[in-house]
Design a protein with these regions (language model features):
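Extended catalytic cores of very large enzyme megasubunits
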Residues: 1-215
Length: 215
């Protein structure tokens, strides 16, 4: 039998997408930022979860040739998708499933590593971590999204590096970011579904997990 949301929506009048979709920011342009946001929201509001790799976004502060300004970097895009997931509740009953990842050598990898350090984020006389502890739904950066760094063949040449060790430390402290390992002929398969069992290198690929009823 099909799994996941195929079963969830079985027998219901409305027809929705099912399971999760794997997305990639194909290039760092305004048009593609809008495009991946549209793809994500379409999947979310019609029943699918999403996983998105934003490694192709330019690092924050990089000069923009067309406008003369500077790039915002990939983290604001993840925050945009996080907000979409916060506000799109499927069928008014089910929260969105989100996953975001970035290559470990990206110049903004350090920012992703510490994006969920809510215990360091002051709000008045308290911290975001304490507010989240008191109210699970209190908004915080990337709180709707699982995040990971992608490790490829280049990492194998120097696995005990500062980025990886900081990733380990952060994972022990906060549980995130996670680790996505992609080696050899699979190193470009950095796209994941929200639960991360399915891998692909193709944008808009679909999770095809199934289930068997043993009852």
């Amino acid at each position: 039998m099909p799994g996941g949301r195929y079963l969830w929506y079985a027998g219901r009048e409305a027809r929705f997408y099912n399971n999760c979709y794997l997305l990639r920011l194909e290039e760092d342009t305004r048009e593609e930022w809008a495009g991946v946001t549209e793809r994500a929201m379409t999947c979310l509001m019609t029943g699918g979860g999403i996983g998105v790799d934003i490694s192709r976004a330019r690092p924050s502060g990089r000069q923009l040739r067309r406008t003369g300004g500077v790039a915002s970097g990939p983290i604001p895009l993840l925050n945009t998708l996080n907000q979409a997931g916060r506000n799109v509740v499927q069928r008014g009953r089910r929260r969105s499933a989100l996953y975001g990842s970035m290559n470990w050598q990206h110049d903004d990898a350090g920012k992703l590593l510490h994006a969920k350090n809510w215990h360091d984020m002051k709000v008045g006389n308290t911290t975001l971590a304490e507010l989240k502890q008191a109210d699970f739904n209190f908004p915080a950066p990337l709180d709707m999204m699982n995040i990971s760094l992608n490790y490829d063949d280049a990492w194998l040449n120097n696995p005990i590096n500062s980025t990886f060790m900081e990733n380990v430390r952060q994972a022990m402290m906060t549980g995130e970011p996670g680790f996505s390992f992609n080696f050899g002929d699979k190193q470009d398969e950095t796209l994941r579904n929200a639960c991360t069992e399915i891998t692909s290198e193709d944008d808009s690929d679909c999770c095809n997990l199934g289930s068997v009823n043993l009852a």
